[in-house]
C-alpha cells in the first residue's frame, strides 16, 4: 500500500519464519513465563494459507493452551479458505484485524490496495461462527480523497458492522518518511 513504510524498511522483501520456529517461540514463552496470549504483529501473517495452517496444526499437535490474535490488519484476500479460519480458532486464535482501508474503489486504486468485499463478508461470517472477533481498519484523509469517497467508506463501515465485524478502527493517514505517500 502507498502509505506503508514496510517495503522501504525491508528492502521489498518478506521473510517468513517456519511454522516450527514460530510455535517453538510461543512454547518457550508459555513454559518460561506462563505467557498465554500472543499478539501477532507480522506485516502479513496470513500471506500463505499453507504456512498459517502449519502453525495452527503445530499449536494443536503440541496441545498448547494459548490464545493468539492477529492485530496488524491483515489482507483478507490472503486467507483463502474457511478451513484456515477453523484451524485458527481450534489453535486459539480469538481476534483478527482486517484492513479494508476505504469504501471507495477510487481511493483503493490511489493507494494500491486490493480488498475483496464479498470474500471479507464470507470470512467474517465464518469467524463469528467459530468464535473469532474481527476488527476492520479504515484510514481517512488520503490525498485525492473527496466527500463522496468518505461517504462510501462510511457505508462500508456500516455494511461490515451489519455483516458481523466486532469492531471498527478509524485512522488518519500519516505520511511516514519512506512511504510512497510521503514522497
Where are these regions (language model features)?
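Short glycine- and Lys/Arg-enriched binding-loop motifs that mark or flank ligand-binding interfaces
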Residues: 95, 137, 174
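C-terminal, active-site-flanking charged/polar segments
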Residues: 119, 156-159, 173-178
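Mixed-charge, polar/low-complexity N-terminal
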Residues: 3, 157, 161-162, 167
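Conserved beta-strand->loop/alpha-helix structural units within folded catalytic cores of enzymes
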Residues: 132-138, 160-162
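Flexible glycine/acidic-rich beta-alpha junction loops that bind and position SAM and/or redox cofactors
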Residues: 49-50, 106, 110-111, 140-148, ...
Amino acid at each position: 500500500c502507498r502509505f506503508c513504510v514496510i517495503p522501504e524498511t525491508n528492502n521489498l522483501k518478506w521473510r517468513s519464519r517456519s511454522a516450527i520456529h514460530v510455535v517453538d517461540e510461543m512454547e518457550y514463552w508459555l513454559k518460561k513465563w506462563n505467557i498465554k496470549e500472543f499478539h501477532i504483529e507480522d506485516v502479513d501473517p496470513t500471506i500463505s494459507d499453507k504456512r498459517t495452517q502449519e502453525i495452527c496444526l503445530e499449536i494443536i499437535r503440541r496441545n498448547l493452551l494459548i490464545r493468539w490474535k492477529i492485530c496488524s490488519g491483515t489482507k483478507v484476500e490472503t486467507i483463502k479458505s474457511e478451513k484456515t479460519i477453523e484451524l485458527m480458532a481450534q489453535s486459539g486464535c480469538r481476534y483478527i484485524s482486517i484492513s479494508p482501508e476505504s469504501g471507495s474503489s477510487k481511493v483503493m486504486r490511489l493507494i494500491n490496495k486490493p480488498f475483496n468485499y464479498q470474500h471479507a463478508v464470507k470470512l467474517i461470517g465464518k469467524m463469528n461462527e467459530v468464535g473469532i472477533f474481527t476488527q476492520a481498519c479504515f484510514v481517512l484523509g488520503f490525498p485525492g480523497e473527496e466527500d463522496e469517497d468518505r461517504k462510501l467508506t462510511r457505508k462500508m463501515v456500516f455494511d461490515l458492522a451489519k455483516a458481523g465485524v466486532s469492531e471498527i478502527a478509524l485512522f488518519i493517514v500519516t505520511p511516514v518518511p519512506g512511504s510512497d505517500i510521503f514522497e
